[in-house]
């Protein structure tokens, strides 16, 4: 069969392989004939969404109608929570889409992007799709080395991606470090600060987003409803930035990109502050529990400010992952992030964490 059309694909796509999501519970049950599965692979909120979200979804009507293409009600709620104007907000089909929109808007084959090793893989994918050259900067203590970033910035740099906290390592950057970095670069460069896990951070020196946005017009903050809000299946996130910048990005955004159920669910979740606080507290308690267990096992891990822990194993992480699958535990191997001996584990409920530790002990013992 003649496939000459393949020679006309856009430059950069040749080197991309499709993103491999974590295995589903259904797939593992079927493949290994298991009845009990604990999924700790994708950094979802193990408590699920707020009951108020479930109520909104169950009562949803008018599914035959298109959603509000501008998301006015949701933007109004976000503007209240974030203390910004609705004109400073762009909605996305997950914050992932917002990252794609930013890349579409500012990257080309003639421009460059900068991001860290061991950072969210979408930064690299979004750059490659645009045919843009990218600089993957060596990490410092598993996190962003902003001084090294400066060494890779030139007149072609258009985008810089900073995840805070970083996924998959869980490291974070203090507010002052980010401010000093922003002051050191040209305001012609767009800096994307990805805060998908910001709600879980418990440090006094964490980024103060309003101060950043008020001082720097070249910054876009992205946030997600997939993590602490528990709305992963609905795909919804948003970006905040200077109104002029957001207006340009909205020219690229597809019509009706965020569905109506997701918009209503997001509003309900933002309204249930008590539930979000309870999710944060549960995560903190269970994170300490897992730290204690890993310490008892003499396993190294990267202290995390997210709802996940990056664990260094004495063996190949992919093999550990495969053995855990057979025992009914789904975690995330991260050799794609150049961390071949690490696995990333979502912090779950107590019974899930206990099951994981039990099966991890069995797996490590079987490797000796």
Provide a role label for each language-model segment:
Residues 1-65:
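N-terminal "arm"/small-domain region of PLP-dependent enzymes with the aminotransferase-like
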Residues 36, 85-89, 110-112, 156, ...:
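Short acidic capping loops at alpha-helix termini that bridge into adjacent secondary structure
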Residues 50, 218-294, 299-302:
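PLP-dependent aminotransferase class I/II
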Residues 67-112:
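Phosphate-binding glycine-rich loop
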Residues 105-162:
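PLP-dependent aminotransferase-like
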Residues 146-155, 168-191, 195-226:
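Active-site pre-lysine segment of PLP-dependent enzymes
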Residues 284, 294-327:
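Conserved PLP-binding catalytic core of the aspartate aminotransferase-like
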Residues 323-327, 332, 336-368:
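PLP-dependent enzyme catalytic core of the Aspartate aminotransferase-like
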